[in-house]
Amino acid sequence: MEETEKRSEKEPERAETAQERTHAALSDLRGYGTAVAENRREHFQCISVIGQVEGHYLLPDGQKATKYEHLIPLLVSIEEDDGIDGLLVMLNTMGGDVEAGLAIAEIIASMTKPSVSLVLGGSHSIGVPLAAAAKRSLIVPSASMTLHPVRVNGMIVGVEQSFRYMREMQDRIVRFICSHSRAKAEKINELMMRPDQMATDCGTILEAEEAVAYGIVDEVGGLDRALSILREMKAKRSENKNEISSLSKKGEKD
């Protein structure tokens, strides 16, 4: 009798599927600014990158941060989830850890699902490649973007070696931006090194229209336009899948 009771107590544990555990984990992550926007037609995952992108070191208390160890597994789950039709990335970030920001940008860029980025407020520093990473990028009229050289904090040991590392890192950032947008490397480097726009730094602050004119962002627009583009991309993806399926079936018959 006791054995039967113990078995029945354990049954609910065995009943929990891997899919249920995944959904539970995603529910926990919603507290970090993510949500699924769904209706009868489609399901789009929305994630936000706000404050600073936190990397290998913890930021001081009182600073808003986006933790890359939260976003990376979430992006993987979005790519693998057949129930999610696309990704909307909302950006209002001052930048942050370069390697962490590029890691997030690389994952977004390598996803097969439709993706749209929307710059709200600002997408500065490493936020620029994050905006360019999506398949389509938008910026609201009141937002801005800042381009500046790579910087480091703290003591530097070996000036020549450190400078070479920063130069290579900056080149990687420029290559990423240019390979995922219409921007030209020569112009991006020029904007990064302008000495006349900021009092304490080199660089350029771009208004929304300027970001589009330089090819960094695709167009000026808001939430409605971003969702409309996602729907168009989802419909085109479905058409392509149907065509491939039809050709595959035709090949099997032949």
Annotate the PLM regions.
Residues 1-118, 122-128, 133-254:
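N-terminal organellar transit peptides
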